[in-house]
């Protein structure tokens, strides 16, 4: 199985490698045949490629069996004409996904909003 790892912005480069490390540990223990490839998105990509979500990232996401995508700072990106693509939106439209689902659970004793 191929996973594409995209660290993103802000806390992403700190937390996404931890998730990738967890997959690598599972792979070693269970022999799942997982391979990971990292592609920069967000400000790191803007600096190197002039775009916050390069076409290469979408192509690799299409070819992968799964993706790990860190948070992105879309509101701070430059205008689209200046390379400021919103990675989440481009992933959803480029992979024909219908929603950006964020699972959540409520816990007893903890008030919900």
Residues of each region from the PLM?
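Anion-binding alpha/beta catalytic cores of soluble intermediary-metabolism enzymes, centered on
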Residues: 1-10, 28, 35, 40-113
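N-terminal basic/disordered segments at the start of proteins
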Residues: 6-21
């Amino acid at each position: 199985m191929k996973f594409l790892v995209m660290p993103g912005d802000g806390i992403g480069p700190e937390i996404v490698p931890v998730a990738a490390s967890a997959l690598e540990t599972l792979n070693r223990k269970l022999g799942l045949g997982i391979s990971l490839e990292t592609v920069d998105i967000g400000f790191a990509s803007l600096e190197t490629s002039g775009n916050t979500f390069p076409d290469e990232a979408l192509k690799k996401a299409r070819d992968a069996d799964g993706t790990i995508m860190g948070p992105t700072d879309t509101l701070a990106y430059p205008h689209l004409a200046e390379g400021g693509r919103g990675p989440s939106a481009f992933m959803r439209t480029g992979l024909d996904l219908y929603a950006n689902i964020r699972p959540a659970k409520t816990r007893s004793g903890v008030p919900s909003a």
